[in-house]
Amino acid sequence: MAVKAGQRRPWRSLLQRGVDTAGDLADLVAQKISVAIDPRARLLRRRRRALRWGLVFTAGCLLWGLVTALLAAWGWFTSLLVITGTIAVTQAIPATLLLLRYRWLRSEPLPVRRPASVRRLPPPGSAARPAMSALGASERGFFSLLGVMERGAMLPADEIRDLTAAANQTSAAMVATAAEVVSMERAVQCSAASRSYLVPTINAFTAQLSTGVRQYNEMVTAAAQLVSSANGAGGAGPGQQRYREELAGATDRLVAWAQAFDELGGLPRR
């Protein structure tokens, strides 16, 4: 029996390695898709594209203008000067339009920065998976609401930045906690003797993850209420101010939870 168990372990190791490789490939594809559809990254790409081609056409216009001036100074045929001058003018038109487009794109505010990458969920069966799955859904909703608030100028830019920082700080705390839970679960699978020591810690960390998700959802709900009140018939008024205060309170509670959990040793120090 011991020999058979030892023979099964390499197969399990290979299977786990294959699952990890497939997960890495899926994460890479998801990250590429996320970057492609991210409004902030899309606007930055449009800016770079307009500036790059604007400079290319500007350089071509200057080059052909210089060629025309040199040919005129050397007394070349008029028809040749017309050709080179026409090329210079033809390139000046798209150069002007592209640089004007770049200036217009620069005047547009950048959308809120979304989470840097698509994170992988804990493996199926992990105690941290439900909380992290719920966090991902809440994050997508919250950053969509932040984009609406930013475009509608419902909050000052500094408050938008504070909300973004709070969301990112909490997400980092929960991701680190989920990684600790997964590591302890693997240790329990490898060593049955450690179960009695690690299971209480796993349960405590999982409870903290649930608390973090609940606090995050409170912030999302407050943000949704603020957007709803701003788009209502009443416009700016006492209701909108009340929801704005509720959003600030929910954000403060979320940041306090993340900081307290960090100070209590729930996160790895870096």
UniProtKB/Swiss-Prot annotation:
> What happens biologically when this protein's gene is inactivated, per the record?
The Rv2743c-Rv2742c double mutation reduces intracellular ATP levels under surface-stress conditions to less than 60% of wild-type levels. Inactivation of Rv2743c reduces mprA and sigB expression to 20% and 10% of wild-type levels, respectively, after treatment with SDS. Inactivation increases M.tuberculosis susceptibility to the intramacrophage environment.
Assign the protein's first listed, main location to one coarse class.
membrane
Q: Which UniProt keywords apply?
A: Membrane, Stress response, Transmembrane, Transmembrane helix
What does the UniProt induction comment state?
Expression is regulated by ClgR.
Function recorded in the entry: Involved in preservation of envelope integrity and tolerance to surface stress. Reverses the inhibitory effect of PspA on ClgR activity. Facilitates intracellular growth of M.tuberculosis.
Question: What is this protein's name?
Answer: Putative envelope-preserving system protein Rv2743c
Give the signal peptide, or none: none
Q: How does it sit in the membrane?
A: Multi-pass membrane protein
Q: Where in the cell is it found?
A: Membrane
GO CC annotation: membrane
Q: Where are the transmembrane segments?
A: 50-72, 77-99
Quaternary data? Interacts with PspA and Rv2742c.
